[in-house]
């Protein structure tokens, strides 16, 4: 006799396997958010043929919203950086929005293209380590399709960080000093940004002055700074000035 018993298995890892979230929101309508997580990377065991020490978590997204349409994306997270959950990922998302005019507020909106997207990179690179110094490079970049993307598709992130920074930097640290340089960019021209192209800084720890008992510590920096208005700011400022004059 032949027995056939189908079964459904699910990984015990909270981020692996298939997960879905149904629900309803005023600006989404009925929705079903789908995610499938698998591990990538690692080396193949020559005996078992299985991958070991997999370090890259990939989460594949397929979302359906009755008022917004379909959205797809993929998130990659470096599990080797578990000590800092705010670093080590690349997140991408794209949605064909069937009604970009929908808002959770009564404020009027400018015309928004139906192609909505996000590209986000947060990563820390170990550039060089020696017994006395550590050199690292950081990238914190978020590129959005429009100023309302986070409000519409990531309300939690919008509440915590409605206008994300875009910074690239490198720093060297030792017991005596920290030397670094970073650049703040205006990747999203619809946001106002305090750009720094670049800024160089030096912090040094407390140390004796000429081998005396007097200690000194300090910080110094130099850079090129510029205040960049968002693309809609001139219109807004002009309107506020006209209203104030009347």
Q: Which stretches of residues belong to each language-model region?
A:
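Outer-membrane beta-barrel proteins and related beta-barrel translocases across Gram-negative bacteria
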Residues: 1-246
């Amino acid at each position: 006799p032949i027995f056939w018993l189908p079964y459904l298995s699910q990984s015990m890892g909270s981020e692996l396997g298939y997960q879905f979230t149904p629900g309803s929101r005023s600006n989404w309508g009925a929705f079903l958010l789908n995610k499938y997580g698998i591990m990538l990377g690692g080396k193949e065991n020559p005996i078992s043929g299985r991958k070991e020490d997999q370090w890259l978590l990939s989460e594949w997204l397929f979302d359906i919203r009755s008022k917004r349409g379909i959205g797809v994306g993929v998130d990659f997270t470096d599990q080797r950086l578990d000590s800092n959950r705010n670093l080590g990922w690349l997140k991408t998302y794209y949605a064909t929005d069937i009604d970009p005019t929908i808002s959770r507020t009564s404020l009027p909106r400018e015309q928004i293209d139906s192609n909505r997207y996000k590209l986000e990179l947060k990563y820390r690179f170990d550039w060089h380590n020696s017994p006395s110094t550590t050199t690292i490079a950081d990238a914190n970049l978020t590129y959005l399709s429009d100023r309302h993307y986070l409000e519409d598709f990531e309300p939690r992130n919008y509440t915590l960080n409605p206008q994300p920074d875009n910074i690239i930097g490198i720093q060297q640290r030792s017991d005596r000093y920290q030397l670094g340089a970073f650049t703040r960019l205006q990747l999203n021209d619809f946001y106002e940004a305090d750009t720094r192209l670049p800024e160089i800084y030096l912090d040094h720890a407390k140390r004796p002055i000429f081998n005396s008992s007097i200690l000194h510590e300090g910080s110094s920096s130099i850079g090129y700074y510029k205040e960049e208005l968002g693309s809609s700011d001139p219109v807004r400022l002009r309107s506020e000035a006209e209203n104030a004059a009347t």
